[in-house]
Amino acid sequence: MDRPPEGSLLPILVTGAAGSVGAVGRTVVEILRQRDLPVRAMVRRDDERAEALRATGAEVVVGDLTRAGDVADALSGCGRMYFGMGVSAQYLEAAMTVAAVARAYGRLEAFVNMSQLTVSEMDLTSTSESVQQRHHWLVEQVLGWSGLPVVQIRP
């Protein structure tokens, strides 16, 4: 794997960086860059939103979170990762793919997962939540079992 010069910080991979729902990923990139931290922003399309991320000084990579090769390429050389993704029918598949790649990569200091507040009120047999909320709960379970250094955020 690529390594930066001794004493320099490894990039932080931010997924969902160009997302428009809540703009959380974009905000994470902006805050990290304001602190002069190296950021690799993963986006689905190279468009004006990707250009805006580049303007912050972030490195931008284009990829699909459901493709292990794309995730592995984006993660290569990174030390930490922020996983966020908008509401999507592919959320569960993407999260499992990202978790599997991150576990195989084996060099993350932190894996920050943007979950949902409602997850704290759920359990194995609850039934009142939406499909997306259930998927977030399942992802938290899998990440907990993964052995990754996970931080769950439930805004």
Model region roles, listed by residue range:
Residues 16-17, 63, 85, 115:
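Glycine-rich, N-terminal phosphate-binding loop of Rossmann-like dinucleotide-binding domains
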Residues 3-37:
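N-terminal Rossmann NAD(P)H-binding glycine-rich loop of SDR-like oxidoreductase domains
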Residues 54-79:
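Conserved Rossmann-fold cofactor-binding substructure of NAD(P)-dependent oxidoreductases
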Residues 84-155:
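Glycine-/Pro-rich loop/turn segments that contact NAD(P) or position catalytic residues
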Residues 39-40, 60, 150:
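Hydrophobic anchor at the start of a short beta-strand
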Residues 18, 42-47, 63-65:
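N-terminal Rossmann-fold cofactor-binding loop
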Residues 37-44, 83:
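Conserved glycine-rich Rossmann-like NAD(P)H-binding loop of the short-chain dehydrogenase/reductase
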Residues 11, 79-80, 110:
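Structural motif
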